[in-house]
Design a protein with these regions (language model features):
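Active-site bordering "gate/hinge" segments
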Residues: 1-180, 185-188
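C-terminal, non-catalytic macromolecule-binding modules
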Residues: 185-209
Length: 209
C-alpha cells in the first residue's frame, strides 16, 4: 500500500522529488473496575495515515504533509479515495509553499484554521479548564464561572462522544461516559472538565472527558 501511494503521488505531479508515507495503528482493549464495583469494558482501535511530499520548481524545494485517522480499523483508511485525498491535500499545500514569501516581523492579527492550531487552544486554554487546577485556585479561570474570559464569538467545547474521531471515547478512564461539555460559550466561562474526585469536591457532576 505504501509503495502504491508513493508511485501514485509521483505520477500525479512531475515536481515531486520525495514522498514519505506512514501508516500506524494500535488496538487497545480496556477494562475498568471501580471501587464501587462498577465494571466497564471497551475496545479502542486507533489508526493514522500520513503523507509528506517535497516539490522542486525552478531550483526551489518546499515540503508539506497531510494526515488523517481515527478510531477505526485499517480498512477504513486504505481505501483509494481516502489516501488519494490526502495526497492531493499535501501536494496542494506544497504548491502554495513554493509561492510563499518571508513573513514580515511584528505584531499582527492571524487567522488559524482547523487542525493543528487546535493544539495551541488545548495548551493555552484547555489545561486551565481542568477541574483540579480550578478547585485549588491555581488556574486563571478559577472562580470565574459566568464571567467573560474570551472574545465574543469564541466557544470552546470538549466532546469525546463524536463518533470515530481520534479523541473519541465511550467513557473516560474512570468509567464516566463521554459527553458534549460546553466550557466557554460566546466568550463566557460556563464550566470545567471534571473527573470524579474533583467533581465531588466541587459539588458538580463529572464530565467524562
Amino acid at each position: 500500500l505504501l509503495a502504491e501511494i508513493d508511485a501514485w503521488t509521483r505520477a500525479l505531479d512531475p515536481r515531486v522529488v520525495q514522498v514519505s508515507v506512514s501508516l500506524a495503528g494500535s488496538h487497545r482493549e480496556v477494562d475498568i473496575i471501580r471501587p464501587d464495583g462498577a465494571v466497564f469494558s471497551d475496545v479502542r482501535p486507533l489508526v493514522r495515515l500520513n503523507v509528506s511530499v517535497t516539490l522542486e520548481e525552478n531550483g526551489r524545494r518546499e515540503s508539506a504533509s497531510a494526515g488523517a485517522g481515527g478510531r477505526a480499523a485499517y480498512d477504513e483508511w486504505i481505501q483509494p479515495g481516502r489516501w488519494q485525498d490526502l495526497v492531493r491535500r499535501a501536494l496542494g499545500k506544497a504548491s502554495v509553499n513554493l509561492q510563499s514569501i518571508p513573513t514580515p516581523a511584528g505584531v499582527m492579527e492571524v487567522v488559524l484554521g482547523p487542525g493543528w492550531p487546535a493544539v495551541l487552544l488545548h495548551e493555552a486554554v484547555g489545561h486551565g479548564l481542568e477541574g483540579d487546577f480550578n478547585r485549588k485556585g491555581t488556574s486563571v479561570y478559577a472562580g470565574r464561572i459566568g464571567e467573560q474570559v474570551a472574545a465574543k464569538g469564541v466557544t470552546v467545547i470538549d466532546d469525546g462522544s463524536i463518533e470515530a474521531r481520534r479523541g473519541s471515547l465511550s467513557f473516560d478512564d474512570e468509567g464516566t461516559p463521554t459527553q458534549r461539555t460546553v466550557l466557554i460559550e460566546d466568550g463566557i466561562l460556563k464550566g470545567y472538565m471534571q473527573d470524579r474526585l474533583n467533581a465531588r469536591l466541587m459539588g458538580v457532576a463529572p464530565t467524562g472527558n
